Amino acid sequence: MNFGKVLTAMVTPFDKHEEIDFQALDHLIDHLINNGSDGLVVAGTTGESPTLTHEERIKLFEYVVKKVNGAVPVIAGTGSNYTKASIELTKEVAKTGVDGVMLVAPYYNKPSQDSMYEHFKVIAESTELPVMLYNVPGRTGVDMDVSTVVRLSQIDNIVSIKDASGNLEKMTNIIRLTDDNFSVYSGEDSLTLPALAIGADGIVSVSSHIIGNDMQEMIQRFEQGQVAEAANIHQRVLPVMQEMFANPSPVPVKTALNLQSVPVGKVRLPLIELTDEQLQNLQSVLSDFEHSKMI
């Protein structure tokens, strides 16, 4: 199932009291839809899901669905390392009108491949919503094998994967061994163009908050056979992509949005704001990028 080319893993705006800032969220959604986002992934890693309560997640999903009003797909992060909790949240989320759910591989428990298969299988069987798997071993401590993904892809409503392993060989084999209607998205911004070259469907991106239109142009150039032009854009946007992960995400991207007059507030603990030196580095990268667009 194809949700679009550039899906933005959306940040969650907070006010000065660290409550969800729905006015800022309204502005952010407009900004993203108007600047290259084909879809929104809500309450994922970038949305600070570990520090959101159950009630906050539901309110977030309800608001985004109502605001978007069908303009782009909305995918809700309902994954957990507790299978029963993920099932319960997924069932409740289905009532909000989201277009799909994203399920992260169980973290901390370090399950086996067979355990992960059973975990995803029972959650998928509990809902009619399309399911996107999320493999992010750098955060979860477990890496989904190709064979596990292929087995799961045979379940009717498991339709996609966001793979943030950074392993293009693995991604290639997933693409090769799954049906054409099973979509594969890179979860690594810097691998957007290489992933397209091996047959991926697109990117679930953090950097698209800042450079969504540039990423769309890069993808369009590639699809039109203008590979050199796409590579030039890739080289130009790469420093921005790298800077978005130079410090724990979503600290850099939230800071960048605030700098660009898209207010999203600060992060919740245990994350903290950038140091003065880190902020200067971010500002320098953004300034250099803007200058490069004028050359």
From Swiss-Prot:
Enzyme Commission (EC) number: 4.3.3.7
Subcellular location(s) of the protein: Cytoplasm
Residues at which pyruvate binds: T46, V204
Reaction(s) catalysed by this chain's protein: L-aspartate 4-semialdehyde + pyruvate = (2S,4S)-4-hydroxy-2,3,4,5-tetrahydrodipicolinate + H2O + H(+)
GO MF entries: 4-hydroxy-tetrahydrodipicolinate synthase activity
Pfam family, one: DHDPS
Parts of the chain that traverse the membrane: none
Location, primary (coarse class): cytoplasm
An example Gene Ontology biological process: diaminopimelate biosynthetic process
GO terms under cellular component: cytosol
Active site per the UniProt annotation: Y134, K162
Annotated InterPro entries: Aldolase_TIM, DapA, DapA-like, Schiff_base-form_aldolases_AS, Schiff_base-form_aldolases_CS
Annotated positions for site Part of a proton relay during catalysis: T45, Y108
Keywords: Amino-acid biosynthesis, Cytoplasm, Diaminopimelate biosynthesis, Lyase, Lysine biosynthesis, Schiff base
Pathway(s) it belongs to: Amino-acid biosynthesis; L-lysine biosynthesis via DAP pathway; (S)-tetrahydrodipicolinate from L-aspartate: step 3/4
Assigned protein family: Belongs to the DapA family.
Role, per record: Catalyzes the condensation of (S)-aspartate-beta-semialdehyde [(S)-ASA] and pyruvate to 4-hydroxy-tetrahydrodipicolinate (HTPA).
Subunit structure comment from the entry: Homotetramer; dimer of dimers.
Name of this protein: 4-hydroxy-tetrahydrodipicolinate synthase
Species in which this protein is naturally found: Oceanobacillus iheyensis (strain DSM 14371 / CIP 107618 / JCM 11309 / KCTC 3954 / HTE831)
